[in-house]
Amino acid sequence: MTLPMSWDEWTRHDGTALAARVRSGELTARELAKQAAAGIARVNPALSAVIEVFEDAIDDPAGNGANPDGPFAGLPFLMKDLGPTMKGRLQEMGSLMMRGNRAASDTFLTGKFRQAGLNLIGRTTTPEFGVCSSAENPAVY
């Protein structure tokens, strides 16, 4: 896969700079999401930090509800698997008891993230119900 920028170039940009490149037309939100997904694929086997990548959000950021005119236009963003919900997406809160739980609606905060232009591309691990400091539950992840 050909990426739109080198990893050295990627790391020299913060989120607002990456979003500015999308707004200017220098990059597309899809290219940015593909680069983020490639980075996740590269480091996640060692970290086990991302439990789900939303391929549909990577392939079609606008279809995922990201505002193309927001201050964070097209910026890939990972949601903690706890707290704000995304309609139709799993939210299992790091718990076997919640396995298969799908959100019925976006929360207010999720709506604000989307309005700001963030492209919600996946979920990250969380300790069970956020109660402790470690998300190393092999039965869940």
Where is each model-derived feature located?
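Gly/Ser-rich catalytic/binding loops embedded in alpha/beta enzyme cores
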Residues: 2-141
